[in-house]
């Protein structure tokens, strides 16, 4: 990559995210303002057939909006990447707030030769020691295994294309397969796929509120004993169902 001009594309998959997207875009706008002058940044919101005001919110904040009808998160991420013009890609969830340091660290890492990576995560509301312990366990596993959380994944655009993007064979867990694929390719090229040592991004804890502990346990056990569950839409309801949808 050139040591001079650099373009970053931030891709936000969004399905009915009118309640969360404004805060995410506000945090992103602040972060973009802190980037060096030689770094350009485009924001792409992928409207996944929303029925609320997601599209109008994104347009009002100056984002490029593209439409993807298929309800499969990997396809939505890939659609955004296909429209992106950047040297580097950041996949950011619509309910996740970032700091200026996240984008500057990503740009610095990619320009220094990183293949890609992720960041630690936090939630805006946790209740009790069990939830806090679960979060700490994930962040430790993420760093040890080099698995990026889906709410914030970044990569060189050329390497994203080289691994074929996110696997569209699955409905959930695509970020783990993506992390593994990029890590393998990075090793062959003498690069690294790394979880950055930086402050966590902050995601909504809505799934903790929406679903009961026993439902979380079912999801965990399903994927623990049946790792291929992500290939079946019925078994990935946790990522696609919202209680108020009925």
Language-model regions: role of each:
Residues 27, 47-55, 96:
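A conserved acidic beta->alpha catalytic loop
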Residues 17-33:
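Short, well-formed alpha-helical segments that are part of the catalytic scaffolds
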Residues 7-9, 42, 177:
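Cell-envelope/extracellular polymer assembly enzymes that use nucleotide-activated donors
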Residues 89:
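Short aromatic/hydrophobic "clamp" motif used to bind/position activated sugar donors
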Residues 159-163, 169-190, 194:
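A short, conserved alpha-helix in the catalytic core of glycosyltransferases
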Residues 36-49, 66:
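Short beta-strand/loop segment that forms part of the nucleotide-sugar
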Residues 68-84:
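Glycine-rich, basic loop-to-helix element that forms the pyrophosphate-binding segment
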